[in-house]
Swiss-Prot record:
Membership in a protein family: Belongs to the bacterial ribosomal protein bL35 family.
Chain positions covered by the region annotation Disordered: 1-30
UniProt cross-references to InterPro entries, sorted A to Z: Ribosomal_bL35 (IPR001706), Ribosomal_bL35-like (IPR021137), Ribosomal_bL35_CS (IPR018265), Ribosomal_bL35_sf (IPR037229)
Keyword Transmembrane: no
Biased composition annotated in UniProt, kind: Basic residues: 12-30
SUPFAM superfamilies: L35p-like
Species annotation: Alteromonas mediterranea (strain DSM 17117 / CIP 110805 / LMG 28347 / Deep ecotype)
Descriptive protein name: Large ribosomal subunit protein bL35
HAMAP family referenced in this protein's UniProt entry, alphabetically: Ribosomal_bL35
Disulfide bond entries: none
Gene Ontology molecular-function annotations: structural constituent of ribosome
Keyword Ribonucleoprotein: yes
Length: 65
């Protein structure tokens, strides 16, 4: 059976935590920031965990992580 390939775009966006879940950067913080409040931008700076229903998809994209 051939080797499974890692999706390189996913490898740049997701990191695995110690508990086996995946974390990523929040979206919506690249442009059009003037209409967004300081509170909203501050909360978008943090990391977020991938939802449980999407974890299987991310694991399939990152077979060796």
């Amino acid at each position: 059976m051939p080797k499974m390939k890692t999706v390189s775009g996913a490898a740049k966006r997701f990191k695995k935590t110690g508990s086996g879940r995946f974390k990523s950067k929040q979206s919506h913080l690249r442009h059009i920031l003037t209409k967004k409040s300081s509170k909203r931008k501050r909360h978008l700076r943090g990391k977020k965990l991938v939802h449980d229903s999407d974890t299987k998809l991310v694991q399939r994209m990152l077979p060796y992580v």
